[in-house]
UniProtKB/Swiss-Prot annotation:
Binds to the 23S rRNA. The gene is rplI. Residues 173-192 are annotated as: Disordered. GO terms for biological process: translation. PANTHER family: 50S RIBOSOMAL PROTEIN L9. Keywords: Ribonucleoprotein, Ribosomal protein, RNA-binding, rRNA-binding. It comes from Rhizobium leguminosarum bv. trifolii. Belongs to the bacterial ribosomal protein bL9 family. This is Large ribosomal subunit protein bL9. SUPFAM superfamilies: L9 N-domain-like (SSF55658), Ribosomal protein L9 C-domain (SSF55653). NCBIfam families: L9 (TIGR00158).
Amino acid sequence: MEVILLERISKLGQMGETVKVRDGFARNYLLPLGKALRANAANKTRFEAERATLEARNLERKSEAQKVADVLDGKSFIVVRSAGETGQLYGSVAARDVVEILGAEGFNIGRNQVHLNTPIKSIGLHKVELQLHAEVEIHVELNVARSAEEAERQAKGEELTSVDAIYGVDEDALRPEDFFDPEADGVDEDEA
Protein backbone atom coordinates (compact mmCIF):
# COMPACT_ATOMS: atom_id res chain seq x y z
CA MET A 1 0.00 0.00 0.00
CA GLU A 2 1.27 3.47 -0.82
CA VAL A 3 0.96 6.18 1.82
CA ILE A 4 1.88 9.85 2.17
CA LEU A 5 3.90 10.47 5.32
CA LEU A 6 2.60 13.28 7.53
CA GLU A 7 5.78 13.36 9.64
CA ARG A 8 9.34 12.05 9.50
CA ILE A 9 9.50 8.38 10.39
CA SER A 10 12.91 6.82 10.95
CA LYS A 11 13.89 4.13 8.45
CA LEU A 12 10.89 5.04 6.28
CA GLY A 13 11.06 8.60 4.99
CA GLN A 14 10.51 12.34 5.38
CA MET A 15 7.26 14.26 5.68
CA GLY A 16 5.47 14.53 2.34
CA GLU A 17 7.12 11.52 0.74
CA THR A 18 5.00 8.83 -0.86
CA VAL A 19 6.30 5.44 0.26
CA LYS A 20 5.20 1.86 -0.23
CA VAL A 21 4.64 -0.06 3.02
CA ARG A 22 3.03 -3.35 3.95
CA ASP A 23 -0.73 -3.23 4.34
CA GLY A 24 -0.70 -4.28 8.00
CA PHE A 25 1.86 -1.62 8.96
CA ALA A 26 -0.26 1.05 7.30
CA ARG A 27 -3.61 -0.18 8.69
CA ASN A 28 -2.44 -0.92 12.23
CA TYR A 29 0.14 1.79 12.85
CA LEU A 30 0.55 4.63 10.36
CA LEU A 31 -3.09 5.41 9.53
CA PRO A 32 -4.66 5.08 13.03
CA LEU A 33 -1.94 7.20 14.66
CA GLY A 34 -2.28 9.92 12.02
CA LYS A 35 1.28 9.50 10.78
CA ALA A 36 0.24 8.91 7.15
CA LEU A 37 -2.58 9.13 4.61
CA ARG A 38 -3.45 6.69 1.83
CA ALA A 39 -1.81 7.84 -1.39
CA ASN A 40 -4.75 8.76 -3.62
CA ALA A 41 -5.55 11.91 -5.58
CA ALA A 42 -7.90 13.37 -2.95
CA ASN A 43 -5.42 12.87 -0.10
CA LYS A 44 -2.55 14.31 -2.17
CA THR A 45 -4.45 17.56 -2.70
CA ARG A 46 -5.51 17.55 0.98
CA PHE A 47 -1.89 17.10 2.05
CA GLU A 48 -0.65 19.94 -0.16
CA ALA A 49 -3.34 22.22 1.30
CA GLU A 50 -2.36 21.34 4.89
CA ARG A 51 1.40 21.12 4.32
CA ALA A 52 2.23 24.48 5.95
CA THR A 53 0.18 23.63 9.05
CA LEU A 54 1.78 20.19 9.34
CA GLU A 55 5.29 21.64 8.97
CA ALA A 56 4.56 24.28 11.63
CA ARG A 57 3.20 21.61 14.03
CA ASN A 58 6.22 19.40 13.36
CA LEU A 59 8.60 22.31 14.01
CA GLU A 60 6.76 23.10 17.28
CA ARG A 61 7.02 19.47 18.45
CA LYS A 62 10.70 19.42 17.54
CA SER A 63 11.42 22.60 19.52
CA GLU A 64 9.56 21.19 22.57
CA ALA A 65 11.56 17.97 22.30
CA GLN A 66 14.78 19.97 21.95
CA LYS A 67 14.02 21.89 25.17
CA VAL A 68 13.56 18.61 27.06
CA ALA A 69 16.70 17.22 25.39
CA ASP A 70 18.79 20.19 26.52
CA VAL A 71 17.80 19.49 30.13
CA LEU A 72 18.05 15.68 29.98
CA ASP A 73 21.04 15.00 27.72
CA GLY A 74 23.91 13.38 29.59
CA LYS A 75 22.07 13.35 32.93
CA SER A 76 22.54 10.43 35.30
CA PHE A 77 19.77 8.76 37.29
CA ILE A 78 20.20 6.37 40.22
CA VAL A 79 18.19 3.15 40.15
CA VAL A 80 18.26 1.09 43.36
CA ARG A 81 17.50 -2.61 42.83
CA SER A 82 18.28 -5.77 44.78
CA ALA A 83 21.04 -7.88 43.27
CA GLY A 84 23.24 -10.86 44.03
CA GLU A 85 26.89 -10.73 45.04
CA THR A 86 28.03 -11.09 41.42
CA GLY A 87 26.07 -8.01 40.35
CA GLN A 88 23.16 -9.83 38.67
CA LEU A 89 19.83 -8.13 39.37
CA TYR A 90 16.89 -10.02 40.83
CA GLY A 91 14.69 -8.90 37.96
CA SER A 92 15.60 -6.25 35.40
CA VAL A 93 15.30 -2.60 34.46
CA ALA A 94 13.12 -2.29 31.35
CA ALA A 95 11.75 0.61 29.30
CA ARG A 96 8.72 1.02 31.60
CA ASP A 97 11.08 1.39 34.58
CA VAL A 98 13.03 4.10 32.74
CA VAL A 99 9.73 5.92 32.06
CA GLU A 100 8.81 5.71 35.77
CA ILE A 101 12.23 7.02 36.84
CA LEU A 102 12.07 9.95 34.42
CA GLY A 103 8.43 10.60 35.40
CA ALA A 104 9.44 10.82 39.07
CA GLU A 105 11.96 13.51 38.06
CA GLY A 106 9.23 15.47 36.24
CA PHE A 107 9.88 14.43 32.63
CA ASN A 108 6.98 13.14 30.53
CA ILE A 109 8.53 10.46 28.31
CA GLY A 110 6.59 7.67 26.58
CA ARG A 111 7.64 4.04 26.71
CA ASN A 112 7.97 3.98 22.91
CA GLN A 113 10.57 6.77 23.15
CA VAL A 114 12.96 4.63 25.24
CA HIS A 115 15.28 2.48 23.12
CA LEU A 116 16.64 -0.49 25.08
CA ASN A 117 17.73 -3.47 23.00
CA THR A 118 17.52 -5.74 26.03
CA PRO A 119 16.51 -5.07 29.63
CA ILE A 120 19.32 -4.15 32.04
CA LYS A 121 20.11 -7.18 34.21
CA SER A 122 23.29 -6.17 36.04
CA ILE A 123 24.47 -3.38 38.30
CA GLY A 124 26.68 -0.69 36.82
CA LEU A 125 26.47 2.38 34.61
CA HIS A 126 24.27 1.90 31.53
CA LYS A 127 23.60 4.32 28.65
CA VAL A 128 19.97 4.52 27.51
CA GLU A 129 18.89 6.14 24.25
CA LEU A 130 15.79 8.34 24.22
CA GLN A 131 14.19 9.42 20.95
CA LEU A 132 12.12 12.44 21.92
CA HIS A 133 11.28 13.33 18.31
CA ALA A 134 12.12 11.81 14.96
CA GLU A 135 15.01 14.30 14.72
CA VAL A 136 15.94 14.62 18.43
CA GLU A 137 17.86 11.76 20.02
CA ILE A 138 19.69 11.85 23.36
CA HIS A 139 21.39 9.53 25.86
CA VAL A 140 20.92 9.36 29.62
CA GLU A 141 22.91 7.28 32.07
CA LEU A 142 21.32 4.88 34.54
CA ASN A 143 23.40 4.09 37.61
CA VAL A 144 21.95 0.73 38.68
CA ALA A 145 23.08 -0.18 42.21
CA ARG A 146 22.03 -1.98 45.39
CA SER A 147 22.03 1.21 47.49
CA ALA A 148 22.57 4.96 47.17
CA GLU A 149 26.06 4.66 48.72
CA GLU A 150 26.99 1.99 46.20
CA ALA A 151 25.70 4.21 43.39
CA GLU A 152 28.03 6.99 44.56
CA ARG A 153 30.98 4.58 44.55
CA GLN A 154 30.05 3.41 41.03
CA ALA A 155 29.80 7.00 39.83
CA LYS A 156 33.39 7.55 41.01
CA GLY A 157 34.48 4.66 38.81
CA GLU A 158 34.66 1.72 41.21
CA GLU A 159 33.82 -1.74 39.85
CA LEU A 160 31.33 -3.37 42.25
CA THR A 161 30.81 -6.83 40.82
CA SER A 162 32.87 -8.81 43.35
CA VAL A 163 32.15 -9.45 47.02
CA ASP A 164 35.44 -7.86 48.08
CA ALA A 165 34.71 -4.66 46.16
CA ILE A 166 31.16 -4.44 47.49
CA TYR A 167 31.96 -4.88 51.16
CA GLY A 168 35.42 -3.28 51.10
CA VAL A 169 37.33 -6.40 52.15
CA ASP A 170 41.10 -5.88 52.08
CA GLU A 171 42.94 -8.95 50.75
CA ASP A 172 46.18 -8.10 52.60
CA ALA A 173 44.39 -7.88 55.95
CA LEU A 174 43.16 -11.48 55.71
CA ARG A 175 46.23 -13.70 55.95
CA PRO A 176 46.02 -17.29 57.24
CA GLU A 177 48.36 -16.54 60.16
CA ASP A 178 45.85 -13.99 61.42
CA PHE A 179 43.25 -16.72 61.84
CA PHE A 180 45.46 -19.17 63.72
CA ASP A 181 47.55 -18.05 66.67
CA PRO A 182 49.32 -21.05 68.24
CA GLU A 183 50.16 -19.15 71.45
CA ALA A 184 46.52 -18.31 72.05
CA ASP A 185 45.61 -22.01 72.14
CA GLY A 186 48.35 -22.83 74.66
CA VAL A 187 50.34 -24.80 72.08
CA ASP A 188 54.03 -24.03 71.82
CA GLU A 189 55.43 -23.72 68.29
CA ASP A 190 58.36 -25.95 69.32
CA GLU A 191 55.97 -28.75 70.36
CA ALA A 192 53.94 -28.50 67.21
